Amino acid sequence: MENMLTFACQQQRRNVRWLSSLSVLMLLAVVLSLCAGDQWIAPGDWFSARGELFVWQIRLPRTLAVLLVGAALALSGAVMQALFENPLAEPGLLGVSNGAGVGLIAAVLLGQGQLPGWALGFCAIAGALIITLILLRFARRHLSTSRLLLAGVALGIICSAMMTWAIYFSTSFDLRQLMYWMMGGFGGVDWQQAWLMIALIPVSLWICCQSQPMNILALGETSARQLGLPLWFWRNLLVVATGWMVGVSVALAGSIGFIGLVIPHILRLCGLSDHRALLPGCALAGAIALLLADVIARLALASAELPIGVVTATMGAPVFIWLLLKSRR
């Protein structure tokens, strides 16, 4: 008994150290994001005339959007991996990201490129929520998590095919631009998208507080039922929350891979297996990873900006493979 208490105390101290370190790293990443750009603006110059324009009007809304989207995607990945008992589960797996893309393409086609940005964002959220509602329809038939996962994969394939057909046969310049936007990027984010940023905050905070049901869900369906967890209720609630976060993230920045898949894995390999530490850790680490990727996307080319989805995949895949090989040793 004493050994168990000692182990629990050591694990708690380890979790606190990890979360404290991630918090400090996130603050440093925010400062770097505000300073970096075509012109380096040190913190001492943030309140100058130049800083008023570049830092507070251009870089700050972009930095906040990157931070919130990174946190939301990493949290979505952690939730899906526990919910579906599948280490490969990630935000795009259920078809929610592709559903948001279909909503955007439908808005561009029906609006003939004349709709404002907020309307496109609303259509992306609507597309994501429609896919979520279809998944809930399947869930009401009390399908197992594996069957629900396969249903999400099938919906994602259908939505991807619809987007490909629409873009391939379109001569609209807006749709060509939309294809580039779906690769992920924060270049067009300003304070007009603040409502999308605000829409991410309450759901992300709520997810961070759901460690108890998440720990039970991670044990598997049979154990969760034996422990008295209302599995159908929590599965539906978490699918809706995940659909909302992914839909808003796609509306804000396009489709971004790697974050939701790899960040929860990396933290588990580092010892953060308890969702009381894993969920806030995912939010912090996801924000850090996407902030660093955004800085690289801005600075890698002198005359253009790389799609952030390309940067996250290029950075993340080798790191993930290295961590897996290290853990096997």
From Swiss-Prot:
Output a single Gene Ontology CC term carried by this record: plasma membrane
SUPFAM superfamilies according to UniProt = ABC transporter involved in vitamin B12 uptake, BtuC (SSF81345)
Q: Which GO terms describe its biological process?
A: cobalamin transport
Q: What is its main location?
A: membrane
Q: What does this protein do?
A: Part of the ABC transporter complex BtuCDF involved in vitamin B12 import. Involved in the translocation of the substrate across the membrane.
Subunit comment for this entry? Answer: The complex is composed of two ATP-binding proteins (BtuD), two transmembrane proteins (BtuC) and a solute-binding protein (BtuF).
Q: Which organism is it from?
A: Citrobacter koseri (strain ATCC BAA-895 / CDC 4225-83 / SGSC4696)
Under the heading Pfam families, the entry gives:
FecCD
Q: What is this protein called?
A: Vitamin B12 import system permease protein BtuC
Localization recorded for this chain is: Cell inner membrane
Q: Which GO terms describe its molecular function?
A: vitamin transmembrane transporter activity
Which family does the UniProt entry place this protein in?
Answer: Belongs to the binding-protein-dependent transport system permease family. FecCD subfamily.
Its membrane topology, per UniProt?
Multi-pass membrane protein
Spans traversing the lipid bilayer: 22-42, 64-84, 91-111, 115-135, 149-169, 187-207, 243-263, 277-297, 305-325
What domain of life does the native source organism fall in? Bacteria
State if Phosphoprotein is listed as a keyword.
no
State the InterPro entries in the record.
ABC_BtuC-like, ABC_transptr_BtuC, ABC_transptr_permease_BtuC
Assigned keywords, A-Z = Cell inner membrane, Cell membrane, Membrane, Transmembrane, Transmembrane helix, Transport
